[in-house]
From Swiss-Prot:
An essential GTPase which binds GTP, GDP and possibly (p)ppGpp with moderate affinity, with high nucleotide exchange rates and a fairly low GTP hydrolysis rate. Plays a role in control of the cell cycle, stress response, ribosome biogenesis and in those bacteria that undergo differentiation, in morphogenesis control. It comes from Novosphingobium aromaticivorans (strain ATCC 700278 / DSM 12444 / CCUG 56034 / CIP 105152 / NBRC 16084 / F199). Coiled coil: none annotated. This is GTPase Obg. Belongs to the TRAFAC class OBG-HflX-like GTPase superfamily. OBG GTPase family.
Amino acid sequence: MHFLDQAKIFIRSGQGGPGAVSFRREKYVEYGGPDGGDGGKGGDIIFEAVTGLNTLIDFRYAQHFKAQRGHGGAGKNRTGAGGNDLVIKVPVGTQVLDDDRETVLLDLTEAGQREILLRGGDGGRGNASYKTSTNRAPRQHGPGWPGEEMYVWLRLKLLADAGLVGLPNAGKSTFINQITNTKAKVGDYAFTTLRPQLGVVRHRNREFVLADIPGLIEGAADGAGIGDRFLGHIERCRVLIHLIDIHSDVDPVEAMHIVEGELEAYGAGLDEKPRLVALNKIDLVDKELVKAFQDELLEGGADRVFPISGATGKGMDALLDAVLEYLPAATVTERPTGEVEEAEDQKPWSPI
């Protein structure tokens, strides 16, 4: 499935139905007069967060969403039926932003969460409501109030408990393959990972979701590389794992400061999140060098440093034990039975 984390769509709520112009004329029935009913209310635009989806790709092809108009009123003071609401289904973690791409209108973080963004217009008044002591047979009626419309941006921020950051080619794909059920692409070149990856980690009878984003380079916050665009996907993480390649040409302390500088430049509180520094690829160097770099990182500002090997799995248990310290009682995947996603039906996916 192709990954898309931003999409622009047009939405319009339904217009209210027109009021009716009707008069009661029945044989042997006294007191006739106007009996036109009011029009029905237009349909609302509703966003619903659903499980089982982690891309906005469907909104590349369906970009206009309009709720149904309310039905017209009828004689005998019958109110028209309301228009059907339009429910737009989006992945959990989706934000709905105004056309300026900055103002957050909705933030859908829970499965099943429903929010009304645009309300349908009220129905127009029927002629019965215009009757007065001086106007016994009014013929005017309300056409129905118009609905609301606007362009909005959808932005997906994946829900993960822990985030994985580092320079390109730091070994993040190998690392996430080692500890999760994900099979990320691995290559001996920078930017092997071109889009965020999610994997479920199971450790000591716990499980949590780990997000891997494309590598960061110096100046990413100013548009260099590709990693800055995806930093939003780790905004919701409780802890970050900073992977540093001990076998790289870049000094580990310098690598740490580059990534920390980009997190601070991006903002959104990323630089304030707890970070666990993982010194990766220790299977390629001797123990003395590992100890020396570990000490340098601690002196350079790291709170905790974990020597690991993504290829062999060495040191992983200690690192994952530390991650568990920052997790809530129930992570993204640890939910009561009643909240677990229901079995998939056979209907093809549609955003409405």
